[in-house]
């Protein structure tokens, strides 16, 4: 498991004074500010953040060292990370998305179905996007106790009982 967890991303600039549009991936979106300073994926660049206001789909924020609209524009797409040990501990039945990505998915009979490509949420519940050599296109598996009875992070595997006809 990675020591860095992605907690947000820069969606672009906001205004003309160097603010950015910040999208938070935290369960409580405002909590992203508690993890300041954030880093880039390599952990080398550090960005102190201050949220300035809520906006549609996120926040306007000041990132340390960003003073102009052009500098803010250049950061569009930047994913922002914090150290895993700064995040709250999760109950046994909850997982950080980053820990699920890359896990192999097996059915209850032990047949490999594929690997988790991403975790998505379209409003109702999380969905695991499963891809693999035997699949024509990725499959979205509901991330529920019924469809995914076992997640074993130590063995890097998921046991799934997918709805009939999904695979």
UniProtKB/Swiss-Prot annotation:
Organism annotation: Ruegeria pomeroyi (strain ATCC 700808 / DSM 15171 / DSS-3) (Silicibacter pomeroyi)
Subunit relationships: Binds ribosomal protein uS19.
The family this protein is said to belong to: Belongs to the RimM family.
Location (main, coarse): cytoplasm
UniProt entry tagged with the keyword Transmembrane helix: no
Job of this protein: An accessory protein needed during the final step in the assembly of 30S ribosomal subunit, possibly for assembly of the head region. Essential for efficient processing of 16S rRNA. May be needed both before and after RbfA during the maturation of 16S rRNA. It has affinity for free ribosomal 30S subunits but not for 70S ribosomes.
One annotated GO biological process: ribosomal small subunit biogenesis
NCBIfam families: 16S_RimM
GO molecular function, one term: ribosome binding
A Pfam family annotated for this UniProt entry: PRC_RimM
Location of this chain's protein in the cell: Cytoplasm
Record comment regarding domains: The PRC barrel domain binds ribosomal protein uS19.
Gene Ontology, cellular component aspect: cytoplasm; ribosome
PRC barrel domain boundaries: 92-166
InterPro entries for this protein: PRC_barrel-like_sf (IPR011033), PRC_RimM (IPR056792), RimM (IPR011961), RimM_N (IPR002676), RimM_N_sf (IPR036976), Transl_B-barrel_sf (IPR009000)
Keywords of this entry: Chaperone, Cytoplasm, Ribosome biogenesis, rRNA processing
Protein name according to UniProt: Ribosome maturation factor RimM
